Amino acid sequence: KNHGFEKVSQLKLAIAKKIKEYVVGGGFLFAMCSATDSYDIALAAEGVDICAQVYDHDPLDPRAQEKLDFSKCLAFQNFSLEKNPYIYEYSNIDATRTRKLRESEDYFSLFEFSAKWDPIPTMLTQNHSRIIKAFMGQTTSFNKKAIKPKVLIMGENKHANEAKYIHSEYGLGFFTFYGGHDPEDYVHYVGDPPTDLSLHPNSPSYRLILNNILFPAAKEKKRKT
């Protein structure tokens, strides 16, 4: 209420809309873990109460699912909300609960792109490895059925039918979403100590994060005439 909102969910919606406005205006958004799907869920649910009573002291809209407007979303569509407050999940965008992979077999592969025809995906997938060890998060990976057709999948686990690393233009800007929390801590729990980055100088997953940090600086320089 100190910020002029009646509910926390209304404040979070305002933040999601401001982030979308930034991208539409030409900004670049890089997000990981639950920062990926939670934005789109908030945007699709504008004006709809999707929060269980335990969160905001009033019941959620019984028609919440059918009132979602996927046209407002950046990356996802046709997803179903998780309405049970006792299940650690927002929707079926995240594939954490449906994937049947052991840690020893949990990998994803990067697609190859042409630097001539696809310069941005080429920059974002630069790596010394094309097969990369996966990792968990509150949002681990993305159900392919929930991804909008215009969104480019740059990394996937084909066997599990899930995307790990996606990118798209939006308005005048771009966004890249990367599923999972900490690439070098397979299951990172709340309260766990931070990973010592010095122990992983050649991490292919950290390289993908670095690609996104450096991407905004990769602007074409003006040529002398």
Regions found by a protein language model. Name each.
Residues 1-38, 172, 212:
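Short alpha-beta junction capping motif
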Residues 3, 7, 20, 27-31, ...:
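Conserved aromatic-histidine-acidic binding/catalytic patches
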Residues 3, 23-24, 63, 190-196:
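Flexible glycine/proline-enriched surface loops and loop-helix/loop-strand junctions
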Residues 17-19, 55, 141, 163-166:
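Generic recognition of flexible, low-complexity loop/linker segments
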Residues 32-152:
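An acidic, glycine-rich "communication" segment
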Residues 49, 144-225:
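Extracellular ligand-binding/catalytic regions of CAZymes and related secreted enzymes
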